[in-house]
Amino acid sequence: MNDEEKHLAAPANAYQPNMHYQQQQEKQTGYNAEYDTHQGGYNQNQNQDYYNHSQGGYQMDNMGQHGGYQGNPNDNYNNQQPPPYTPDFPPDYNYKPNPNAATFDEAFAVPKPKWNDKIGLVILALIFSGYLALSIIVIRAYAQTHSFQGWGIYSGENDYSLNTHTLILYAFVLATAMVLSLLYFIAARVWTKQFIWITYILHLLFSWGTAIYYLVVGYYSAGIVFIVFAALTTWWFWCSRKRIPFATIVLQTLIDVTRANPSVLVISAVGTVVGACFGTWFSFTIVSIYVKYDPDNRNPGCMTTGGSCSNGKLIGLILFAIFCGYYLTEVIKNVIHVTISGVYGSWYYCSKSDQGMPKHAAMSSFRRAVTYSLGSISLGSLIVSIINFIRQILSVLQQDARQSGDTLATVLLCFVQCCFGVLDWLVTYFNHYAYSYIALYGKAYVPSAKATWKLMQTRGIDAMVNDSLIGSVLSFGASFVAYAAALVAYCFLKYTDPSYNSGGGFYAPVVGLAFVIALQVSNITNVSLKSGCSTFFLALARDPEVLRVSYPQIYEEICRTYPPARDKLDI
């Protein structure tokens, strides 16, 4: 059978590449199969917007009263099965959501829903159970020695380790993180056009100001670290300033969706509160671990149930609690991500249809996130948490090597830490799009990651995503909140001057933990915009014609501010 016969014998719902993609394949692989517009190729009628894949594709000649994407009325979306993924082509673009569905589950139907990645559910249950058991043991020890730990900033007898004073400190840290995170999100809605510039300027001013302040007060180690961060941020801002107009268009689109769908704001607010509540529990657990397992001879916590005290046990349990806390906040954040992806996906495909937005899109998406997709979310969160945990261990080892004067070990550990940093960036980068794919199509974690990777490469959207700057801007905003919270923690320690920090030995752990807690709270708040960005680019890569037909003004603005987009989105 020759190439033409194979082409004619293709199943009706097979993927038929458009001419642009076909030409790319011919150039790259020498693929010479004939492209026959009569058998399913792209055929453009100059008199009307008409896209008809005659072998089971979609058509748009009937736009409806809203002028949006209406899909093909002959398609059976409830029974339609996605084609198998192959390394040669991305997932079939003809497998599309139903824009005229009344509910989210109908619009993004999963033919045979099942609990994906069950191993992720087991891991989540084990980690949560372990963290809960540890928390109960140590908090009970704190309660039993509460009079020794004190009732306020100065009332305790504990002058050797963290106590009630530290809990009050973290209360201020969490309040700072919550307020600034919500204000930052509100600023994105109120001053959308200026938001990216405001973020960069505030981040630069605050990072340089914090670095200079630390140097002035003699906290040189933190000052040097913040100077490095500030210098890198300045360099990044200078290199990316020309891409700000394109990023502004994308951000305006995302904010407009939040205005039209108040559920996004509600989810963000609830997520911030949940993140802050977990941060309270986490900080209480960390302080209580010191209360229970600090090996000081005066520690009454050693006499409570839960085992004896030792320095090794203290360090080990602190590391375990930090890993569990980071992992659980990642799960919380990514559940919100998947939930909001459902809302943005519904907007992209359905808001301009005759039916309009599906009913209860947020609630239906949340239900899918905490049932069928929870294992996938847990598995993806675990990978990121392990990488970050290893990075933190390497950072501690590097500091020890530097203090001991071992230059070779310091350099090697720095190199390994940089490698893990790149790995962390890559995994986090593709996790965003994998979670959006999971939200819309109900697939497992690994198939979703593979599909999004191939889809981004095929369309060339990966470079477009990098140039959008949205992820970087939101990361800078979260860092700004974390800097502010860390500064609050440092000032609280410095000016209240607790006896346990008389030698300054607790500056690093207390301030560092404050930074991490505030960063996670801010990331949870900002995930609604990050989720919207990843869902927008995922849908754009998969179905660019929907944007061109349903939202022509947005499409033209994107092409105007980012000229390569027209070639990348060749439809």
Swiss-Prot record:
Residues 1-96 are annotated as: Disordered. Residues 140-166, 211, 285-311, 391-406, 494-503 are extracellular. GO terms for biological process: transmembrane transport. It is a multi-pass membrane protein. GO terms for cellular component: membrane; plasma membrane. One of its GO terms (molecular function) is transmembrane transporter activity. The chain crosses the membrane at residues 119-139, 167-187, 190-210, 212-232, 264-284, 312-332, 370-390, 407-427, 473-493, 504-524. Keywords: Cell membrane, Membrane, Transmembrane, Transmembrane helix, Transport. Belongs to the CTL (choline transporter-like) family. This is Protein PNS1. The gene is PNS1.
